[in-house]
Amino acid sequence: MDEKKKIGILTFHNAHNYGAVLQAYALKTKLNRMGYKAKILNYQNPYIARLYRKGIHVDFWKRDILPSRWGKVFHEVGENLYGLREWKNQWTAFEKFIGEKLLDGQEKKLTLNDLAKERCDVYILGSDQIWARELTHGFDPAYFGQFAPGCKKISYAASVPNGSIPEAEQAYFEQALKSLAHISVREEKLARVVEKLTGKEVTTVVDPTLLLERADYEDLLYEEPLVKEKYIFAYFVVEDELLGKCAEKAAAVLGYRLIELHYKKTPKLKSENMIFDAGPREFLTYIRDAEMIFTNSFHGTVFSILFQKKFYSVYKENGRISNLLAFLNLEERHITAEDAMNYADGIDYTHVGDKLCNYRRQSVEYLKKGIEQ
């Protein structure tokens, strides 16, 4: 019997963001179920790692603490202290999930030089905006596969902001991506640009979270609901007044409790119905048991669909959500005003599931081709 191929995944697995950790979990899980031996490599971009280290920190190294900046600095520290208990709980929940579900107990952080020593049969770069220099404080060679010459590397659903590459950065991409055996990205727009730069075929694929079905996430959920009564769930990836108003109106009309999930507690956010310390498991459990969901998040939308919920995505501009809704013929779930809601409207998830299944199949075929050929 042939030994399983060893796959090393490089992504933003250590970011304390529901989408970031769940996409990493999904890609690793899918590859293992496809018969490979997948492992998330514990390489952490220094800048991103610093953002999520434990403890309150102020960017002294930026020289942001000139006397003219003291007011802003103390305001930021004050807001952090205000939500310190919740932030610590959230930090602990994310670190537990990352350690147990993503890294399988790995503790050593890998350097660029360490990556070659992992001796993987294939290295997969992605998903997420791993090619965004503004996120990694300059291009990070690890996410472009610039290590272990001669080892096979492919990308999966890699991305950049707005799906476009500034002209000044195109020469770097042209050179850096030449070493990849196969390339896939998140956006069609980006695919065309990368094809032109590299001369390679570039495939668009689903977000890794969509590679799995609802049942594949069951092991992450709490058995019992976190809220006993019926509730509307509102998830804010960024604060938005309209999103809050839509969720409040729906809860009032339907007579349900409103539960809001926010990333950070501030003095402006005060309600017993607001949650600030949820980890990935809590996030998914809140979605599973909600009667209806309101969100301005791509992954909030994704999991609303996977868990076959009534939902509304509330935003002004978000190409990523809009593209997903258009592909699944769910454009009516995007609203920009309170009076656009129809509480009786259901969703034909049979049709949605069929389209999703086909798209998922194409992405799995890309992975098989990328690994085996």
Regions found by a protein language model. Name each.
Residues M1-Q373:
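Active-site anion-handling motifs in enzyme catalytic cores
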